């Protein structure tokens, strides 16, 4: 089936690529794709195209990669060229998903149906850069995807559609990301079909109550504070997979802790102390309960199940991970 609604798409990572693929496969014309410039990545730090760029190039879509869209910003010449291109490209709506660049008011007002953002949370909870991580870290039972009519604020626009997704006890950011990407892809196609059919989408202002912000994840957050309850640390480990991982310092070496669950602990063990080692994992005392770590990684090594890790890097009961503030 083909559609007449013309969609400019702006997005960068895999989450966005899933939406672009769904829009394209549904038959909506995509006259232009915006994505961030290629970035160095990997061990060789070679320039890598974004997931959105790779998908668009493989299908012959026009792609622009401006470093900014702000006329008065750091890259005024590039911004002007990109804005001229947007003005010259006939379109009806812009869909934005994890693009990573601020859209000035000029861009927000350009499409006749405005700009629709695909946000990976149930707004107004978890506005901001890391909604998937923060939902898991906080112990939320569910999250979802919200389609929002973009305005000048940070994820403050009116809500158009939402889809709810349960957070499973073993979900990591990686697994939940994939669920939400699929939900967002379905949701945006349904919304575009409705927009084309009716000419407008019903918009509901976000409530003033329940607003929370999902701050960007920093590498420093990887360090586990063993004084916290084990349940909170287990959520932290899941929230920070694949980035930045959980981390603990043992005898001066920083180990990455990739999978863990909370188990009963011992009252006589100081937080951070290894209290048990077995084929099922390494059990570490916490402020409340204990954390059983089932997947570890030593510096320069690979992520390994506990059994394989211990075969090459034995640990001992009584060893103690350094406090987070001393690591």
From Swiss-Prot:
Q: GO: which molecular function terms?
A: methionyl-tRNA formyltransferase activity
One Pfam family name from the record?
A: Formyl_trans_N
- Keywords per UniProt: Protein biosynthesis, Transferase
| GO cellular component terms attached to this protein's record | cytosol
The UniProt record gives the binding positions of (6S)-5,6,7,8-tetrahydrofolate as: 121-124
Please tell me which top-level EC class this enzyme sits in.
Answer: transferase
InterPro entries this protein is in? Fmt, Formyl_trans_C, Formyl_trans_C_sf, Formyl_transf_N, Formyl_transf_N_sf, Formyl_transferase-like_C_sf, GART_AS, Met-tRNA-FMT_C
Task: Report the EC number(s), separated by commas if there are several.
Answer: 2.1.2.9
Catalyses which reaction(s): L-methionyl-tRNA(fMet) + (6R)-10-formyltetrahydrofolate = N-formyl-L-methionyl-tRNA(fMet) + (6S)-5,6,7,8-tetrahydrofolate + H(+)
Q: What does this protein do?
A: Attaches a formyl group to the free amino group of methionyl-tRNA(fMet). The formyl group appears to play a dual role in the initiator identity of N-formylmethionyl-tRNA by promoting its recognition by IF2 and preventing the misappropriation of this tRNA by the elongation apparatus.
Q: Which family does it belong to?
A: Belongs to the Fmt family.
Record NCBIfam families: fmt
Name assigned to this protein: Methionyl-tRNA formyltransferase
Give the originating organism. Answer: Burkholderia mallei (strain ATCC 23344)
